[in-house]
């Protein structure tokens, strides 16, 4: 459902996700969208209620940043949103995180809304949350603590369990 939408649109993709653990297909689609000139921004919590998920998400961000995808870590209170808007036209919101279990095994559901007015409202919320976020800079990201980066890489194979 998501990859065709990511591949179809041309201007922007704004994702907010509490537990950002996408599979390789979604990661590749997001990087390809950025390479086509799409403004791809992903927001997830700086700190969530699951430290293992936080570490895995940062490891995935390490793959996305060099491809030009903007990573924002939300610094406000608890972020539990699961939204995506594309090109001020297409939106999804619901209970499903971008992780394998939410998309295939858990009893999660998202609504897809194709409505420009709704998408603009979703984008306004995203931009408000973005103001409370810290954007990851590629040069600083790659210079993070080597032990932290090693831990993120070693936990990556576990992303399908969450």
Please give the residue ranges for each predicted region:
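A short, well-structured juxtamembrane/interface segment
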Residues: 1-2
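Structural alpha-helical scaffold elements that stabilize or flank donor/cofactor-binding regions
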Residues: 5-6
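PLD/PLD-like phosphodiesterase catalytic module centered on the HKD motif
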Residues: 9-15, 19-162
